[in-house]
Curated annotation (Swiss-Prot):
It comes from Pongo abelii (Sumatran orangutan). A lipid is attached at G2 (N-myristoyl glycine). The gene is NCS1. Ca(2+) 1 binds at D73, N75, D77, R79, E84. Ca(2+) 3 binds at D157, N159, D161, K163, E168. GO terms for biological process: regulation of neuron projection development. This is Neuronal calcium sensor 1.
Length: 190
């Protein structure tokens, strides 16, 4: 993808429509917007954080945006290209529940070892609490990241080994209506 091309090559559009839940027209529209916002064709972590700040002005989304950026950045080059962007957007906005849960698992599995540890989950949950700031009133049993993580692990860590497998995470998430609802938040919006 060249610098600030306003159109994608037909073969790239075709490939992205195969790999995503977007139509050819939608891929082209998203590309136009992406190039408008990122004329270089790449989005770095600072730019990604800036976007998150627009959506969460009352908290500090920096840490969470960095975690999400790292999942979007599939090839780990420190930048998100359009292909990485549109594929992640497709899963998070239009993917099946299982696809979204696999994506969320990658977000929480910070060291990519195939497990979510208590500390990894605490890092993400703490980042979420920082991001939403005081805009959300939480119940007493979840008013700190530690309490929330304790509750999640009590529910999901069936073999009590202190880490969650993808299967434990998927089953536990599906059993918690608030998690399913959160994962479905953007359905149909994009």
């Amino acid at each position: 993808m060249g610098k600030s091309n306003s159109k994608l090559k037909p073969e790239v559009v075709e490939e992205l429509t195969r790999k995503t839940y977007f139509t050819e027209k939608e891929v082209q529209q998203w590309y136009k917007g992406f190039i408008k916002d990122c004329p270089s064709g790449q989005l770095d972590a600072a730019g990604f954080q800036k976007i998150y700040k627009q959506f969460f002005p009352f908290g500090d989304p920096t840490k969470f945006a960095t975690f999400v950026f790292n999942v979007f950045d599939e090839n780990k080059d420190g930048r998100i290209g359009f292909s990485e962007f549109i594929q992640a957007l497709s899963v998070t906005s239009r993917g099946t529940l299982d696809e979204k849960l696999r994506w969320a698992f990658k977000l929480y599995d910070l060291d990519n070892d195939g497990y979510i540890t208590r500390n990894e989950m605490l890092d993400i949950v703490d980042a979420i609490y920082q991001m939403v700031g005081n805009t959300v009133e939480l119940p007493e049993e979840e008013n700190t990241p530690e309490k929330r993580v304790d509750r999640i692990f009590a529910m999901m860590d069936k073999n009590a080994d202190g880490k969650l497998t993808l299967q434990e995470f998927q089953e536990g998430s599906k059993a918690d209506p608030s998690i399913v609802q959160a994962l479905s938040l953007y359905d149909g919006l994009v």
